[in-house]
């Protein structure tokens, strides 16, 4: 059974951090440069997470040739709700969320793989040094998400069985971090920039075992938007590739402001932030769906007959 936190005194300690992290979320949208009005705008939902960084940089540097609007959200629930209602045309999401939406009848496609970054942070208990030390401990997570999936996959015995632990439901990542600092949690998987923030606060942060959470996010679109707003989709992908090339060829000091604006973190943290190895646009490898989908079926989140058929369409011709 997933435990609920007994109190919320950690919330006060999180307030300052939350204000910092949401500072860049207050504006409702940013518009990429280009032929405004030439085509219906492609509206993307974005969040303060490193997998959105190439899109944010492309928007700021005018790498989009067509109208691409970025609408900021502060939580995955808000983002996914906007996608479900058609308020946005697309957003980066994890494979699990995309498959869950498609299994419920959402006309969704996932044409582009993206790169995120997650690590596990320990609390202040100095006896906890390895993943195997977390047997029976209190682990913060959000149920039925890739975080719960990754937690179960990471905490395994030498024989491959999931180690028993006490899951504590903490959906908001800033609160999860503050509960680690206050001793209410023994460990939790955190996305960037929160893992780096945990390290700057003196918490021990470790990488997850290879393959568990390396290939789990992609850029999803409503199928209708992907098919009818093709010029803007092509512009988005070209701009995405230009942004990655720019990041690879330019010292981080020259674009650290984009990290600060997107993630709401101080420049000194942005400079040491562990960023993923960004790749130019490519389709998701559907073999990475299999372990996630198997886990989802075990949890009865999708029907046993569901196979994610048609979820990954071909990328458009960029010529």
Predicted regions: what they are:
Residues 297-319:
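Conserved C-terminal helix/tail region of periplasmic/extracytoplasmic solute-binding proteins
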Residues 49, 77, 92, 141-146, ...:
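Soluble non-cytosolic domains of exported or imported proteins
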Residues 227-303:
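Secondary-structure end/capping motifs
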Residues 56, 99, 152, 196, ...:
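Predominant activation on well-ordered alpha-helical scaffold segments within soluble catalytic domains
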Residues 96, 126, 164-168, 172-259:
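Pocket-lining segment of extracytoplasmic ligand-binding domains
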Residues 1-41, 319:
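Short, low-complexity disordered leader/linker segments with a strong preference
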Residues 36-163, 167-170, 179, 186-192, ...:
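Short, glycine-/small- and polar/acidic-enriched structural segments
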């Amino acid at each position: 059974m997933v435990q609920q936190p007994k109190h919320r005194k950690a919330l006060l300690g999180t307030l300052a951090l939350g204000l910092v992290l949401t500072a860049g979320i207050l504006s409702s949208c940013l518009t990429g440069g280009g032929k405004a009005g030439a085509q219906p705008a492609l509206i993307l939902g974005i969040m303060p997470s490193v997998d959105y960084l190439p899109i944010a940089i492309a928007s700021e540097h005018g790498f989009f040739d067509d109208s691409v609007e970025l609408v900021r959200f502060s939580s995955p629930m808000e983002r996914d709700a906007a996608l479900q209602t058609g308020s946005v045309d697309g957003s980066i999401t994890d494979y699990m969320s995309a498959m869950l939406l498609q299994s419920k009848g959402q006309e969704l496609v996932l044409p582009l793989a993206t790169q995120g970054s997650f690590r596990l942070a320990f609390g202040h208990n100095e006896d906890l040094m390895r993943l195997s030390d977390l047997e029976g401990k209190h682990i913060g997570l959000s149920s039925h998400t890739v975080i719960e999936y990754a937690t179960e996959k990471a905490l395994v015995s030498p024989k491959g069985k999931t180690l028993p632990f006490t899951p504590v439901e903490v959906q908001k990542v800033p609160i999860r971090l503050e509960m680690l600092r206050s001793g209410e949690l023994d460990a939790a998987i955190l996305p960037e920039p929160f893992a780096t923030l945990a390290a700057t606060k003196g918490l021990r942060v470790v990488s997850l075992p290879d393959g568990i959470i390396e290939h789990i996010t992609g850029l999803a679109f409503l199928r209708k938007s992907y098919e009818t707003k093709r010029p803007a989709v092509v512009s988005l992908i070209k701009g995405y590739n230009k942004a990655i090339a720019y990041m690879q060829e330019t010292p981080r000091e020259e674009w650290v402001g984009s990290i600060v604006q997107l993630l709401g973190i101080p420049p000194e943290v942005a400079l040491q932030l562990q960023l993923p190895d960004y790749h130019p646009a490519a389709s998701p490898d559907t073999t990475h769906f299999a372990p996630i989908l198997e886990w989802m079926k075990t949890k009865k989140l999708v029907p046993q007959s569901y196979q994610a058929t048609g979820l990954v369409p071909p990328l458009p011709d960029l010529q």
